[in-house]
Structures are given as C-alpha cells and as structure tokens.
Amino acid sequence: MRVFGIIAGIVITALIAMGGLVHALDVADVVREWTPEGKKLAAERVKLPAHDEMVLIPAGSFTMGSDRKIDHNAYQAEFPQRKVYVDAYEIDKFEVTTVQYLKFILAKDLAPLIDWQYDGGNFQETMVNHPVMHVSWDDANAYCKWAEKRLPTSAEWEKAARGEDGRIYPWGNQPAGLSRANFGRTGLSGPVRDRPERLLLYPPIVSVDKYENAVSPYGVYQMSGNVAEWTNDWYDQNYYKTAPDRNPKGPERGTQKAFRGGGWIDSTPSVRPAQRNGAGPNTKMNWLGFRCAKDVKDSGESQNAKPQ
C-alpha cells in the first residue's frame, strides 16, 4: 500500500521537472481508508441532493466520426465519418457526481477515493456537485450496475453529445472557449504553486450543471471538458473503419477502454466529442470520470423525438 505522503512527493518532483505544468498522475495503486470522523461526515454528506436526471435519446441515425475537410483538428481514430443507426436509450443528463458515487461507496462499504481527503480534510460540501474522478473503468462499470444502469457505448455517447448533424461541439461548430467548457487548465499560479499536490489530487473542475449555454442538442451537459468519460467499448484506433452501421458496440476484445469528451487538462482538439482515446481499465486519473446510460423500450415517442 502506498501512502499519501509518497504520492505527494512524486507529484511535486514531477511538477518541478515539468517547469510548473500540471500533468496527470495515475493513482490506481493508491489505497485510502476511512477515518471515523471522515465516515461520519460522509454519512451526512450523502443526504445532500444529487443530480439523477436522465435524458431520452431517440432511435435513429446520426453522423459519427469526423471529416477533415470540415474539422481540421480531427484525428485518425475519427475516420471515416458516416451515418450510424442507434436504438433509443437514456443517458445521464450530468456526469456522475461525488455525492452520487459516495452513496455507492457507503452502500458497498468501500474505501474512499483519494481526493475525498485532500488537503488534510474529509469529503467537502463543495465537492458534492463536482464530477467524480479517480475512478477506473471497473469502478464506473460497477457503479452503473449498482444504479441499475450501464455505461454508454462509445457511439451512444457521441450521439448524445453531437446530435444528428455531425456538429463539431455540443453547441455547434463554433470553437471551444472557457465560456462554454472547462479545459486547458494546465498552468500553476498563485497559492497553488506552494501546494502542487493539491491541484493534482483535486484539480480545477466545476459543478456538473455549469455551462447551460453549451448543452448538447438533447440537453446533455458537459460533453466537452471538465472530466473525460469512460464508455463501455474496448478501444481500437481503427474501429470506425469496420464498425457496423447499426448499434456499434466497439471491438470484441482489447487492452484499453475507450473514453470521450476530454477534461480540464486537455487542449481544444481533445474536447471535441468526436475525439476518441483509450486507457487501461484499471487507470484512475484526476481528469477522468463517467456517466451512465440505460436501455429503453422503443416507442413511437422515442422514434419521433427530435433534438432541440
């Protein structure tokens, strides 16, 4: 078991070597334990309101992937662009929050996440509506099953983010900016320079309901930036070349799980919803969270529903 002091030392050394720029630290092998005071406080925090709303995404086709003639930031993993049909489903309107995940942790009697005790404290009230982070794909999958949901497929995630028309960002084709998304926050400044490990363990993320002006055509929040999000698929850079035209679910096997959306640490190209990447299922990062999806029985209502 590695202790917090060792991790903090590694972080500080890394930051000095990188000249004050924040890079992510995988904390998959870090184990924390509840203090009696911390668990008591968590039992109170878990009573606070949570964002549990889901959004219906209607059955139908959407434009998946990118066309470099239109999007000059497109990566190889986004080609070719084409129409794909996806059955109706529901997806969380917001990223899973710390208080939602706390309910799961307490119900399963699991250890707290590393950032829940940052800066010598315990689960802070200011964290309640922040997206959960430092969760592996296995953690995210377990939570969704516990909540009687599932992780969205990569195609479902992309459709919920972009709508039907292949727009570059959830709000349209206008470039990403800090008025619409939380991204590009990699510099150390002010008091943070004296406590760089605090920034890595609890970075500059924002509440999941911020940026109402940047929701997707279906009203889904923060599909660009804040934290990137795990999906159910295995990741293969070349998958779009052979993916089926109906309900693609990713490769049958792999070594990495796909994540989407980019996080606070990423640059503009990486917060485009078409961008795909992957990481090992056990990876836990301070820019990586998730949201859940749910199957629905198709109906005339879901067939006829349209994005805004």
Model feature map: region roles:
Residues 25-47:
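N-terminal pre-domain segments of enzymes
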Residues 9-17:
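Bacterial N-terminal signal peptides
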Residues 286-300:
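Short, structured beta-strand segments at or near domain termini in extracellular proteins/domains
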Residues 16-28:
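Bacterial Sec-dependent signal peptides at the C-terminal "C-region" and cleavage site
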Residues 42-44, 70-80, 194-195, 276-281:
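Short, P/G- and charge-enriched loop/turn segments at secondary-structure junctions
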Residues 1-10:
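N-terminal Sec-pathway targeting helices
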